UniProtKB/Swiss-Prot annotation:
Binding-site positions, substrate: 48, 153, 303-304
Signal peptide coordinates: none
Provenance organism: Schizosaccharomyces pombe (strain 972 / ATCC 24843) (Fission yeast)
Catalyzed reaction equations: keto-D-fructose + NADH + H(+) = D-sorbitol + NAD(+)
Lineage: Eukaryota, Fungi, Dikarya, Ascomycota, Taphrinomycotina
PROSITE patterns membership: ADH_ZINC
Protein name: Sorbitol dehydrogenase
Cofactor(s) needed for function: Zn(2+)
Described function: Polyol dehydrogenase that catalyzes the reversible NAD(+)-dependent oxidation of various sugar alcohols. Is active with D-sorbitol (D-glucitol) as substrate, leading to the C2-oxidized product D-fructose. Suppresses growth arrest induced by a p53 tumor mutant in fission yeast.
Residues the record lists as binding NAD(+): 201, 206, 277-279, 301-303
EC number assigned by the record: 1.1.1.-
Any one GO molecular-function label of the UniProt entry: zinc ion binding
Amino acid sequence: MAPAEKAFVLRKKMDTAIEDRPGQTLTDDHQVKVAIKATGICGSDVHYWKEGGIGDFILKKPMILGHESAGVVVEVGKGVSSLKPGDPVAVEPGCVCRLCDYCRSGRYNLCPHMEFAATPPYDGTLRTYYITTEDFCTKLPKQISVEEGALFEPMSVAVHAMTRGNLKCGSRVLVMGCGTVGLLMMAVAKAYGAIDIVAVDASPSRVEFAQKYVGAKPFTPIAAKENESLPDYAQRYKQAIIEKYGEFDFAVDATGVGICIHTAVLALKRGGTFVQAGNGKPVIDFPINHIINYEINVLGSFRYAHGCYKQSLFLVSNGLVDVKPLITHRFAFKDALKAYETVASGEEGVLKVIIGGPDA
């Protein structure tokens, strides 16, 4: 019998505990067991903790949190050929069927049978060991730490958004939101040849970080007038941006906030591309006539698909994107709740918070 493990468990809304969980054993020849050494905290993790659910995904029983993880392989199935015990890996936190049309076309993020870590009812990665399949692990070279490997998950979100929008070299790019994902979108856009990147966020420290991190040009959101309609506000907001920086070829929203989305669409050139990557309200006002008349390409971007982790590995290992500056806080596993409280505080200067493994 496998030894017991430690796990950071969400028992119910705002109720967490470090628990002993039964040890796990491999059940398939192509599985690997990974000792988790570093886990980043995502906004969705905090939302589950604070609200007990996201949309249709409602916590109905205790769930292990975490999905941005990396660690070291400790055991492999007899069918595993590309990994061995001792290999450091970034863990892709979804399990798919591999049989549906979406999986077979490489768009496995759309698999209707997806089992995604720390999405009810499936347990996450904040535990001693996580069992997954060989092909959902990305081996890390010596120059990349497991902390950097943990950031491959949000970076793959950024890679997928740029890929969905078919970002062209020489594009002028507008990014709404300077959280970790928004900053990584800027970094990936720069690596892909964007010539101008404008960063928009209400947080002065985050906009300043974007300037230093990728050379982004800053823009601070303008305030709405009293009783001003959202379309009128968006028109003023857009005008303020383009008077300073001109129109854009490509815009991406990482906030999910209605005014940011509306404004970003309006700030595009005719024939421009808008990618929505941030979750928000289920229904918002959208400038549909503008989209039609300007032939704006509007795309949704959900998580990541085939090749995104490998592309993240390429960008980081070749020095095209540096994820290390994004890590602002580190906590031991025993202090996982403090880590969540730090992210939830919304304090200036907090970007990516990393929790070490139980035996790190």
